[in-house]
C-alpha cells in the first residue's frame, strides 16, 4: 500500500527588537549569562509586564507579509506550565485570538512549479530561558532569553513531501528576513522549527497519527528528519503496526529520529486571559502605517530582475536569497553597475571569499561603490580580469577606492605597444631554447611565450594587446 505524506510546521521566530516583549531589558543575543535580566524577567512579586509596541509592529508586518487577516481586538493569554527556565510558571502568549490568522505563502518547488501553503495562525509570545547541564552534576538556568519576543507561525498541514517542507521554510525565511523583523539565524536560535508528520492511505480524508520532530537545527536536517520519518512510518504501517503519537528528535550522527517521549494526550495548559495586560485595539491606521513600511518582496524582485534587468531566473533566485545580497545588488546597479557583471561577481568571487572567510557580506569592507568602480576599470582596460581578483580581495579586506588602490599598488594593465615590445624582445633573449624550438617548427612552441610574457609583466600585460604584439614579433622572429 502507498501512503500520502502530510506535514505541518511550527516555526518560532525571534523578533529583533532592542528590548524584550514585556520588560525594558536588552534582547541582544550572545551576552554573558544572566546579564540581560531584571525583576520582570525573574518574576519578582509585584512586578507587572509592559507591552513593547515594537513587538506588535513586527507582528502586524509579519501578518501582512504572509497574507493574513489581523485580529484587531488584541489580548494576551497565560499558558500555564512549570519548568526551571520559566520563573513565572506560566508563559504570556496568545491562544484563541492570535495577531494573524488565515494566511498563505507561495513556494517554488524544485521542478519549477509553485504551490500555495496555508498558514493557520501567527501569535506573539515570550521566549523561555535556557537550561544547561554541567559536567559538575549541576544544572544552570540562563534567563537572558527569558522574555525575548517571539512570533510563532503555524502552517496548515498542506505539505505533501519533505521537499515541500524545505521549500516552505526557504520562502518563509525570505519573507521574514525582507520585512526586517528578524535575522532568522537558526544557528543563533532566532528561527526554530518543529515538524508534525503523519501518513495516510491515498484517498483517505482523515489524518493519520502524527509524530512531532524536534532538534531540527537546519533546513537540511528538517528535510532529512522528515525523509527518515516517511520511511519509518511507512514500514510500520505496511507491517500491520500502529503509529504512536510521539515526540522524536533528529540525530545527525545516526541520520535517524530517536524517541524522546510518548504523547498520551494533549497537554492541558489551562489558558486564560492575561490579567496584567489590558486589551487594546489595532486600528486600521496602524495597520496601514505598517503596510507602508513593507519592502518589495523576493518574488517581486525576482520578476523585476528578469523583466527589467535581463537576468536569468537562476541569477534572480540567487541574488534574492538574502536581503543583504539583494540590497547590495540594487545599490550597485543604481550606481551604474552593469547588472550581469555585478551579479557574476556576487555569485562568483564574492561568494567564494565569504565562504572561505566564514563571513557575511555586511561583515567585509566591500561596498557597492568600490565594486562598481572595480568593474568599470576592468571594462576600460585599466586592469585585467586576473588582476581584478587581487584587487577584489584587497577591497574586501580593507575597503577604499578600487582605482586608487590599483594606481598605488602599480597594478595598472600595460597596453602601450612601446612598453610591451621591448619586454617581448627581452623574453626572446632570456629564453633561447624556446626560440630555437619555435624556429625549428616544434609543435605549440609559440604558446610558451605567452606565459613568459605574463610572468615578465607580473600579469599586468593587457592580454588582447599582448597576444597581438607577440604574434607580430614571433612572425618577425621566424623570418630572421
Curated annotation (Swiss-Prot):
It catalyses: L-glutamyl-tRNA(Gln) + L-glutamine + ATP + H2O = L-glutaminyl-tRNA(Gln) + L-glutamate + ADP + phosphate + H(+); L-aspartyl-tRNA(Asn) + L-glutamine + ATP + H2O = L-asparaginyl-tRNA(Asn) + L-glutamate + ADP + phosphate + 2 H(+). One of its GO terms (biological process) is glutaminyl-tRNAGln biosynthesis via transamidation. The keyword Lyase does not apply. Its EC number is 6.3.5.-. The keyword Protein biosynthesis applies. Keywords: ATP-binding, Ligase, Nucleotide-binding, Protein biosynthesis. PROSITE patterns: GATB. One of its GO terms (molecular function) is glutaminyl-tRNA synthase (glutamine-hydrolyzing) activity. InterPro entries: Asn/Gln-tRNA_amidoTrfase_suB/E (IPR017959), Asn/Gln-tRNA_Trfase_suB/E_cat (IPR006075), Asn/Gln_amidotransferase (IPR018027), Asn/Gln_tRNA_amidoTrase-B-like (IPR003789), GatB (IPR004413), GatB_C_1 (IPR042114), GatB_Yqey_C_2 (IPR023168), Gln-tRNA_amidoTrfase_suB_CS (IPR017958). Heterotrimer of A, B and C subunits. Allows the formation of correctly charged Asn-tRNA(Asn) or Gln-tRNA(Gln) through the transamidation of misacylated Asp-tRNA(Asn) or Glu-tRNA(Gln) in organisms which lack either or both of asparaginyl-tRNA or glutaminyl-tRNA synthetases. The reaction takes place in the presence of glutamine and ATP through an activated phospho-Asp-tRNA(Asn) or phospho-Glu-tRNA(Gln). Belongs to the GatB/GatE family. GatB subfamily. NCBIfam families: gatB (TIGR00133), PRK05477.1-1 (NF004011), PRK05477.1-2 (NF004012), PRK05477.1-4 (NF004014). This is Aspartyl/glutamyl-tRNA(Asn/Gln) amidotransferase subunit B. It comes from Streptococcus thermophilus (strain ATCC BAA-250 / LMG 18311).
Amino acid at each position: 500500500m502507498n501512503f500520502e505524506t502530510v506535514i505541518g510546521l511550527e516555526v518560532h521566530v525571534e523578533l529583533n527588537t532592542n528590548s524584550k516583549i514585556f520588560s525594558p531589558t536588552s534582547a541582544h543575543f550572545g551576552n554573558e549569562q544572566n546579564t540581560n535580566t531584571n525583576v520582570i524577567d525573574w518574576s519578582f512579586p509585584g512586578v507587572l509586564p509592559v507591552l513593547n509596541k515594537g513587538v506588535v509592529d513586527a507582528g502586524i508586518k509579519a501578518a501582512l507579509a504572509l497574507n493574513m487577516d489581523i485580529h484587531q481586538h488584541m489580548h494576551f493569554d497565560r499558558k500555564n506550565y512549570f519548568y526551571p527556565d520559566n520563573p513565572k510558571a506560566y508563559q504570556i502568549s496568545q491562544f484563541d485570538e492570535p495577531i494573524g490568522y488565515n494566511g498563505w505563502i507561495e513556494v517554488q518547488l524544485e521542478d519549477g512549479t509553485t504551490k500555495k501553503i496555508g498558514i493557520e495562525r501567527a501569535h506573539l509570545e515570550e521566549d523561555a530561558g535556557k537550561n544547561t547541564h554541567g559536567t559538575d552534576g549541576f544544572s544552570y538556568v540562563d534567563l537572558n532569553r527569558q522574555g525575548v519576543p517571539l512570533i510563532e507561525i503555524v502552517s496548515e498541514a498542506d505539505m505533501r513531501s519533505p521537499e515541500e517542507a524545505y521549500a516552505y521554510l526557504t520562502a518563509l525565511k525570505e519573507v521574514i528576513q525582507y520585512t526586517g523583523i528578524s535575522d532568522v539565524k537558526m544557528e543563533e536560535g532566532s528561527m526554530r522549527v518543529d515538524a508534525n508528520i503523519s501518513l495516510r492511505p491515498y484517498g483517505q480524508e482523515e489524518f493519520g497519527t502524527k509524530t512531532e520532530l524536534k532538534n531540527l537545527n537546519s533546513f537540511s536536517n528538517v528535510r532529512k528528519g522528515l525523509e527518515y520519518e516517511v520511511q519509518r512510518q511507512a514500514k510500520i504501517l505496511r507491517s500491520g503496526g500502529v503509529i504512536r503519537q510521539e515526540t522524536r528528535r533528529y540525530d545527525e550522527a545516526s541520520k535517524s529520529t530517536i524517541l524522546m517521549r510518548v504523547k498520551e494526550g494533549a497537554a492541558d495548559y489551562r489558558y486564560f486571559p492575561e490579567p496584567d495586560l489590558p486589551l487594546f485595539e489595532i486600528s486600521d491606521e496602524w495597520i496601514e502605517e505598517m503596510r507602508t513600511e513593507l519592502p518589495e518582496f523576493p518574488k517581486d524582485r525576482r520578476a523585476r530582475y528578469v523583466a527589467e534587468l535581463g537576468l536569468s531566473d537562476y541569477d534572480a533566485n540567487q541574488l534574492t536569497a538574502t536581503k543583504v545580497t539583494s540590497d547590495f545588488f540594487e545599490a550597485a546597479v543604481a550606481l551604474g553597475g552593469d547588472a550581469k557583471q555585478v551579479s557574476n561577481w556576487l555569485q562568483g568571487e564574492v561568494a567564494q571569499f565569504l565562504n572561505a572567510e566564514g563571513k557575511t557580506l555586511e561583515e567585509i569592507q566591500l561596498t557597492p561603490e568600490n565594486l562598481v568602480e572595480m568593474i568599470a576599470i576592468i571594462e576600460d582596460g585599466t586592469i585585467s580580469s586576473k588582476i581584478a581578483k587581487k584587487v577584489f580581495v584587497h577591497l574586501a579586506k580593507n575597503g577604499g577606492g578600487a582605482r586608487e588602490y590599483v594606481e598605488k599598488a602599480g597594478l595598472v594593465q600595460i597596453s602601450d605597444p612601446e612598453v610591451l615590445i621591448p619586454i617581448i624582445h627581452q623574453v626572446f633573449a632570456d629564453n633561447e631554447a624556446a626560440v630555437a624550438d619555435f624556429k625549428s617548427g616544434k609543435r605549440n612552441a609559440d604558446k610558451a611565450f605567452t606565459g613568459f610574457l605574463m610572468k615578465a609583466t607580473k600579469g599586468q600585460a593587457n592580454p588582447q594587446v599582448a597576444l597581438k604584439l607577440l604574434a607580430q614579433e614571433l612572425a618577425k622572429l621566424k623570418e630572421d
